[in-house]
Design a protein with these regions (language model features):
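Residue-level signal for the membrane-embedded core of alpha-helical transmembrane segments
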Residues: 3, 24, 83-87, 135, ...
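Transmembrane helix-loop-helix
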Residues: 11-14, 66-150, 179-180, 184-209
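Interfacial/capping segments of alpha-helical transmembrane domains
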Residues: 40-59
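C-terminal transmembrane module of polytopic alpha-helical membrane proteins
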Residues: 1-32, 36, 103, 118, ...
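Central hydrophobic cores of alpha-helical transmembrane segments
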Residues: 109-112, 154-169
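Juxtamembrane membrane-interface segments at transmembrane alpha-helix termini
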Residues: 41-42, 62-63, 120-124, 143-150, ...
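Helix-boundary and loop/linker segments of multi-pass membrane transporters
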Residues: 16-20, 57-63, 155
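Alpha-helical transmembrane bundle and helix-membrane interface signal
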Residues: 98, 145-158, 223-230
C-alpha cells in the first residue's frame, strides 16, 4: 500500500509539472483549434480547398505556396490522427521543456516539422498533413540526449529504440511502390498485394526527416563547445610542444 501511494504521489507530481509547460500545451491547443475549424470547413464543402492550400505537396510548392512547409504541421486528417499527435506532443514536448526550456522544445519541433516536410517533398508523395515530423524530432532528440534511459513498458534503451525507428522508417520510405526503387519497392508492392496498402498511407519520409533532424540537434548539443578558456589552454599546449 505504501508502494502504491508512493507511485501515485510520483504520478501526481509529474502531472503537476507537465501542467506548467506552456509551449507544449500551446501547440496542442492550436492544433485542436485548427482541426475544429477545418472540420467546420469540411462540413460546409470547403474542406478540400483548405487542405490543398495548407497541406504540403510538390504541386503547392511549385505554385509558390511556400507557407505549406509550416502550415502542414497544424492540419490533421482525422480525430484519431490529431489525438495521437497531441498525446505525443504532450508527453515528449513537456519532457523536453522540463529539461531544456520552452525555446528548445519549440525549436526542435519546428525544425523537425520543416525537415520532415522537405524529406516528404524529396521521397514522399501526395498531400502531407500532421505534426509527425516534429514529434519524431522530439522523440529522437530525447533518445540521443539520454541514450541509456530505459523506455517503459518496452524495457529497451532509448538508443536502441531510436535506431530501430530510424531504420524502420528508412526501409518503409524506400519500399513505397510509388517511389519505384529497384528491388526494395517490389517488396512494398508485395505488401500492397497482400492487403497492407495502408502501411504506405503514413508519411514515413516525413518521420525519417524529422527523426534525423532530432538526432542532429542532439548531437550538436552534446558536442563540447569551445570557450575562451579552452582556446587558451590549447594555445598553451601548442606553445609547450613547440619548445620541446
Amino acid at each position: 500500500m505504501i508502494f502504491q501511494r508512493g507511485m501515485l504521489d510520483d504520478l501526481a507530481d509529474d502531472l503537476r509539472l507537465r501542467a506548467k509547460m506552456p509551449a507544449s500545451w500551446g501547440i496542442v491547443i492550436v492544433m485542436l483549434l485548427v482541426h475544429l475549424w477545418t472540420q467546420g470547413e469540411v462540413g460546409s464543402g470547403n474542406g478540400d480547398a483548405w487542405y490543398e492550400c495548407l497541406g504540403l505537396s510538390r504541386e503547392g510548392m511549385s505554385d509558390g505556396r511556400y507557407w505549406q512547409i509550416f502550415s502542414h504541421g497544424l492540419l490533421h486528417g482525422s480525430w484519431p490522427h490529431l489525438s495521437v499527435n497531441a498525446v505525443l506532443i504532450w508527453l515528449l514536448g513537456t519532457r523536453m521543456e522540463r529539461m531544456l526550456g520552452w525555446r528548445a522544445m519549440l525549436g526542435v519541433t519546428c525544425l523537425g516539422m520543416i525537415a520532415g516536410g522537405l524529406m516528404h517533398l524529396l521521397l514522399g508523395h501526395g498531400l502531407l498533413v500532421g505534426i509527425s515530423g516534429g514529434v519524431m524530432a522530439l522523440l529522437l532528440c530525447l533518445a540521443t540526449l539520454s541514450p541509456d534511459a530505459r523506455v517503459l513498458p518496452l524495457g529497451i534503451s532509448a538508443k536502441n529504440l531510436g535506431r530501430g525507428i530510424l531504420v524502420g522508417e528508412l526501409v518503409l520510405t524506400l519500399a513505397d511502390p510509388a517511389l519505384g526503387m529497384p528491388i526494395i519497392s517490389s517488396i512494398g508492392a508485395m505488401l500492397v498485394d497482400h492487403g497492407y496498402a495502408s502501411v504506405f498511407q503514413l508519411g514515413h519520409a516525413c518521420h525519417l526527416g524529422g527523426g534525423l533532424m532530432g538526432v542532429i540537434i542532439a548531437l550538436r548539443w552534446r558536442a563540447p563547445r569551445l570557450t575562451l578558456e579552452m582556446l587558451r589552454l590549447q594555445r598553451e599546449m601548442r606553445e609547450r610542444d613547440s619548445k620541446r
